């Protein structure tokens, strides 16, 4: 069975996203996607959701 993990990143920057990606993939999670929450008045995302998956048997 496929298991999902969603990590909420409230401080969206290259460094924080890189840290989350490196940390979770080192734990055996596979990167599945990234979604950004935007505010109309700003050009930068206010939040990011990073999605990972792995097989339940790998836990």
Where are these regions (language model features)?
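Terminus-proximal functional modules
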Residues: 1-59
């Amino acid at each position: 069975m496929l298991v999902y993990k969603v990590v909420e990143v409230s401080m969206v920057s290259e460094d924080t996203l890189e840290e989350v990606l490196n940390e979770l993939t080192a734990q055996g999670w596979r990167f599945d996607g990234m979604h950004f929450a935007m505010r109309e008045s700003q050009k930068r995302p206010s939040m990011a959701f990073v999605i990972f998956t792995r097989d339940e048997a790998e836990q």
